[in-house]
Amino acid sequence: MYLVFDTETTGLPKKWNAPLSDLDNWPRCVQLAWQLHDSKGILISSHSYLIKPDNYNIPYESEKIHGISTALATNIGYDLVSVLNKFIKDLSLAGFIIGHNVKFDLNIIGAELLRVSSDVNLLEKDILDTCTELTANVCKIPGGRGGKFKFPTLIELYSFLFNDNFSEAHNASADVEATARAFFELVRIGIINQSVFKGYPELSEGLRTFDESKVPLFGIKHLNLKKESEKISDKASKENPVDKKIIDSIPEKLISSPFSHLHNNTQFSVLQSTSRIANIVKKAGESNMPAIAITDRGNMMGCFHFIKAIKSYNNSISSDSSDTKIKPIIGCELNVCLNHKDKSNRDDGYQIVFLAKNKNGYRNLSKMCSVGYTEGFYYVPRVDREVVEKYKEDLIVLSGNMHGEIASKLLNIGESQAEEALLYWKNLFEKDFYLEMMRHGQEDEKRVNENLIKFSSKHDVMVVPTNNSFYLNKEDANAHDILLCVKDGEKQSTPIGRGRGFRYGLPNQEYYFKTSNEMKFLFKDYPEFFDNISEIVDKVEVYELARDVLLPKFTIPEDFESDSDIDLENEYLKFLTFQGAKNHYKDIDNDLEERILFELNVIKNSGYPGYFLIVQDLIKAAIEMGVSVGPGRGSAAGSVVAYCLGITKIDPIKYDLLFERFLNPDRVSMPDIDIDFDDEGRGRVIEYVIEKYGANQVAQIITYGKMAAKSSIRDTARVLDLSLGDADRIAKLIPNLKLKDIFEKDEKKLNDDLRSEDFSNVLELKSLSNGDDLQAETINQARILEGSLRNVGTHACGIIITPDDITNFVPIATAKDSDLFVTQYDNSVVESAGLLKMDFLGLKTL
């Protein structure tokens, strides 16, 4: 007989080659499942048992993989001895033990047998493994050691043999059924044969029934462990309302104390956070927070959107409402290393949080953040202490997370070195330096916090409670973990840890944007810390980032004479326009003169004469360099001034084109002139701009590559190990709509808006999302990830020119595909931020 078995565990061993007697090394078995088949492959019995934890908990990271929570195993699990006795009884009937990567499972059960003082020896049986070089050479998946094929996972082997996916991977019961089916199929097709095991002839004979088709499934129903764990969690939440429990345990004097989150990552921490700015603001409002800060890693891309979102929220609060208006605090988490210009060795430095107290602080933070990219980028953007000292004015500093300098030195070097670091930051920022205490439920934080309290008292440095948030709600933890896997190209099934065979991941699911009451509950033993947060909030001023567009100064020729120095640009523009009119028109009659003067007056009142002078200068320079220039496009063709200056080559008088479509006197906005150059000449024009205005005043515009509906499905599917076929099929069900719209819009509205075929696909997609399988999980996690920033790039044609050093206005970065700097703000906000944007298009057809 054949016994096929599998286990789910509390994790992985520290040492794979440790003896079974080293019981501390071997994880505990939380599920044991097996099937017993006769000598011809016929299923005799199947069993699956959860094991009740005995003085241990099931780690969250393991629960994420197999779905078995401590609560679920405690509620429906069996004691270890009774499960092992049932297993041993069937084991005694079998001559062969079968598994996938079976050595691991043999060690797990072997260790458990030792724990209960059993003398059963599993190795007395013949062992057959479906994860060997034999199956590796069948599946032919590249990536193995020494140039060989890699050993296939159970999903990969199953998919290869049956061109299908089994959805309950990492449920021992389903894994056993899949392993058994794969094993018998390998025997049926002769891959596993007489040369591998002695029972082949009889088993092969029994499998002849399936000569015309593949070995079928055995029809076993599997309990959805993740759903069952969620049910218990939901039930517990209803029976013990968390908010009420939390509020009841908060000291009365702390209930009315305000709390503000000062350490938050948004979606602009690329591939590291799922939190949308608008959602953070909304949740902060619901929790009556008087302020919130954003502190994205190494960049300030979200600042403008943050200010805008808070302004919108505050404007929505009526004057008679009791809701609290929110103060925005702009910040950034910077990597402070030893020498930011040294790129001979990797030094990511320490993660330190900086908050801007006012507009000047924002400028200094913007400059520091820019230096991190333009001078210090090496794996990550970096600054050093010298840079911090240069731009420290009007900044508040928080000591950071476990990767901050003080915490990191406490954990890795020593207390005295950590204390020296504290004194450096305290002496530099005085009362604007604060120690940051976190309670995510980690042992390393407990060790650090003990010292922070001691340091605070000894050196008179205030402590503030924070929660380093990367996602909005606790239930978003899994989606965030998937995002981290997307970033690193990993599968979620890869265990979290360091070194080969492990991946990066957060230690637990506590890194969410907690409510005020949750934070008060966490720090109820230190109520005075909340006053320190209020002190920081009071130090921060409210300021605007939006401003009118600032044009670079256009140099008027010295020989140009004017009656007014104040109106020099308007006078020179008028001079050039009429000079051009003489070249374009035989006769300047009253109607033409009136039209020109009308346009010049509108341009004067708009305050943008310099813009026209700059554009005509660029076009003139391009022509002189032999660069082909297009005739003009869009509404600018309606301007006779643009025509006379040579900006456009279309006569608006001849074709009766309206100037008001270009620049309306009743609704003045920044004119927008797109300029076409030949593809090769465009670069020469940009070089001219850099030479004329300076490299520190010219930049391209960043673009944000977001995870759209289909790409979020495909990325999530890859991380969760859903088959390519299923991922492709699901992605193709999505019409040209966001997942958010598909799942939140009324079905009648969707039916009205979509073609019948697309609507049918949408209904199928929704139906799949309600399932209990891997396809449903893929869809539902992709819904959370949709819209997350996946990468950054550069705008195809946008160029920014500023009147002074660009970092005086916005933070900048570097880009792989550009020699120019790029703004950290994208095209949607650069004009609102006061930047002159010009579109230089390169066309091969010119």
Residue spans for each PLM region:
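Histidine/lysine/aspartate-rich catalytic loop segments that bind and position anionic ligands
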Residues: 121-137, 263, 400, 406
